[in-house]
Amino acid sequence: MATTSTGPLHPYWPRHLRLDHFVPNDLSAWYIVTVLFTVFGALVVTMWLLSSRASVVPLGTWRRLSVCWFAVCAFVHLVIEGWFVLYQKAILGDQAFLSQLWKEYAKGDSRYIIEDNFIICMESITVVLWGPLSLWAVIAFLRQHPSRYVLQFVISLGQIYGDLLYFLTEYRDGFQHGEMGHPIYFWFYFFFMNVLWLVIPGVLFFDSVKQFYGAQNALDTKVMKSKGK
């Protein structure tokens, strides 16, 4: 982006960015965040109740929480990130709620409003792959489908890989796309909201490995017993 001679007319970093089509949000940050987390909360409560009624076998607390997680992932990947992928060229000047959400988030990472190639490619993969697979994982756990732990493994590994690249590319750029150390824009928007996709998928990844290990061990034991007869 080119520099401006009169100073920046936007809240994004680096400050010399020229954003000719930028329209400031008419919704407050608190309103946007409140609506977002209200939707998340409603989705978690709904899936928590559904997981006790729609599952073909009773699920434990841990497994019901993982179903809630994949439901949230499906919503985030398909709806929120899907909006970005479809409208990333228009978001800067658009006033739809999801466009304003992305303009607010971009205060912590301006790559989302400057058509950054990595962000566009990474988000496109997320929408096309991890969104539908997360929805499938919800159904698979509720129906006790044999693919459920394979889905959990693949989705979690993909999320971890994408998130690591997300952090590392910004590190390589010197954290220039946001105000380093800002309590909200850096630590909450950029760090906390993304590190969740390292911590939770990390736990689920190792849970999948544990399930694979147990299944393989049971199969090997069965084979050894049959050969010993």
From Swiss-Prot:
Coiled-coil positions: none
Catalytic activity: lathosterol = 5alpha-cholest-8-en-3beta-ol; zymosterol = 5alpha-cholesta-7,24-dien-3beta-ol; 5,6alpha-epoxy-5alpha-cholestan-3beta-ol + H2O = 5alpha-cholestane-3beta,5,6beta-triol; 5,6beta-epoxy-5beta-cholestan-3beta-ol + H2O = 5alpha-cholestane-3beta,5,6beta-triol
Keyword line: Cholesterol biosynthesis, Cholesterol metabolism, Cytoplasmic vesicle, Endoplasmic reticulum, Hydrolase, Isomerase, Lipid biosynthesis, Lipid metabolism, Membrane, Nucleus, Steroid biosynthesis, Steroid metabolism, Sterol biosynthesis, Sterol metabolism, Transmembrane, Transmembrane helix
One Gene Ontology term of the molecular function aspect: C-8 sterol isomerase activity
Listed pathway(s): Steroid biosynthesis; cholesterol biosynthesis
GO biological process: cholesterol biosynthetic process; hemopoiesis; ossification involved in bone maturation
Keyword Lipid metabolism belongs to the record: yes
Entry protein name: 3-beta-hydroxysteroid-Delta(8),Delta(7)-isomerase
Organism: Cavia porcellus (Guinea pig)
Gene that encodes it: EBP
